[in-house]
Amino acid sequence: MWLEKYRRNRSIDETSDDSYEPFLSASELEEADEKALGTKRNRRRRFSYFTCGTLWGSTFLFLLLLFSIIFSIVRSFWGVEEDPDSIFTGWGKDGSGTESLAWYPTDFLRDVTPVPCHSHNDYWRRIPLFSALRVGCVGVEADVWLFGNSSELYVGHDRAALTPHRTLQSLYVNPLVDIIERNNPQTPFYNSSGTHRGVFDTDPDQTLVLLIDIKTDGAKTLPQVEAQLEPLRARDWLTYIKDGVIHERPITVVGTGRTPFDMLMQNSTYRDIFFDAPLKELYEDPNIPDTGENNEPYVYNRTNSLYASVNFRRAIGSVWTDLSEGQLRLIRGQIKGAHKRGLKVRYWNTPAWPVIRRNKIWHTLMAEGADILNVDDLKAATRKRW
């Protein structure tokens, strides 16, 4: 009878993995059932732990990736860049040799490739001139002030920013003389006599534009600017025009601000300061084909000017998302007129924020034919081609 009972129980309940033993006591049967149930619970628990661990790990990795993407977008949006002055951490410190501006590091220019950018308000940078050169800018800007009977030209954005030691000589002329002298050495292997290697070792023929923005009376200040440039002129390092022929040199000086155009033109045989022409006045309809004919000589041309510049915000207007067709037509007409006269186009006071809009405007200007970017953010302007 026990055999029939065993078979009947086996057919009714096969939920347990352990074979039913008819000879076990009731307590032993309960203990066996509890062990089987515990085994199943352990298996479920291990599976739950594995599933939860996988989900938590995947969530953590996803959040980490998401944070990295958001961080990159924020850096791009806000224009967070590396500091180009980081190599000058010892500048001006005791024992560095820079206390009196007697030492200038030229080694940092050996691997620098020139980039068509202009360092706007360059004197605001931690290391004027050198910060711009380090990233490859081919133009720097200095605002100069003349006071009373002094012959010194002080450099700064306004009167409150001027100091006795920040002058055109100390910040620009003397450092440029030192850099170019080192790039034109007198050695048994190289005779620097009559050579004109510029500041960039990778492109020694590239001229550096020194844009001098005269802030005080032009008629009184311009003669002092000419006098302050004598160390460069005496070494034949200033681009000049003589008898109608332009001679390119390592430094090209351009006068802007209150620079008097009529005074620059007084010497018809020799000039080594060029004018920053008013770009807005050079507009020509971009939709009219250029026949190449010109019945009258241009007032502003390559013999007296280099740049043709304008305040972007005033000449073109505000930009919200993209440049309008009307704004593009203005830009094309101004660029057409400047290039027809052999001048380089420079827009200043372009929108600086948000960075996405700024970059789009930079790209559009260069695509339309602008020759140089007028920038405050050196790293962003030189990290890619526009």
Report residues per predicted region.
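Aromatic/hydrophobic pocket-lining residues that form π-stacking "cages" and hydrophobic walls in ligand
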Residues: 128, 138, 334
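Short acidic, Gly/Ser-rich segments with clustered Asp/Glu that frequently serve as metal-coordination loops
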Residues: 139-151
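Asp/Glu-centered strand-loop micro-motifs enriched in Gly/Pro and often flanked by an aromatic residue
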Residues: 118-123
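Short alpha-helical segments and helix-capping/turn motifs at coil-helix boundaries
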Residues: 124-127, 237-239
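Non-catalytic positions within long, well-ordered alpha-helices that form the structural scaffold/packing
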Residues: 133-134, 366
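Catalytic cores of phosphodiester-bond hydrolases, prominently lipid phosphodiesterases
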Residues: 1-114, 149-386
